[in-house]
């Protein structure tokens, strides 16, 4: 927050996403209106639903910008819309559906694969330059790849996904992150295998 002037960067990122989606739909269709709603900040879900209803819209499709499964990234959104419909007296008069989580879609995974590829190239160039001028850093000479994500409490992660399934890492939230990490590494290995020489993850 400090690096962004005391505000969350997410609203500005959502405005940029909204503009990009509007442009893409204007160019390719379908020609449908797109609006933006927030759970915890203006514009609030209930206000946006009320306005959409007043403008004659009866079917709403929600895209939550959180890619992975979990209570706060999936079910809580559904609950928020359900509560808003009840509060506004619109239950049964307006339908709200939500797009599935997108952690495993090619475009999402590819962005991270491209980032890892570019990052490995840069780090390897920096390491080579330091070796060339005799200022090599301490260590074993291997590059450690670390995948990190939004932190959620273990109890919240454990609430992600159906019960009775033996998820890798203990929850669907952890398992899906591991699947994406492996898919990213597999893409780099397939297309630029030498970049993974002398790396650990």
Task: Give a label for each model feature.
Residues 1-201:
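Active-site-proximal alpha-helix that buttresses catalytic centers in soluble enzyme cores
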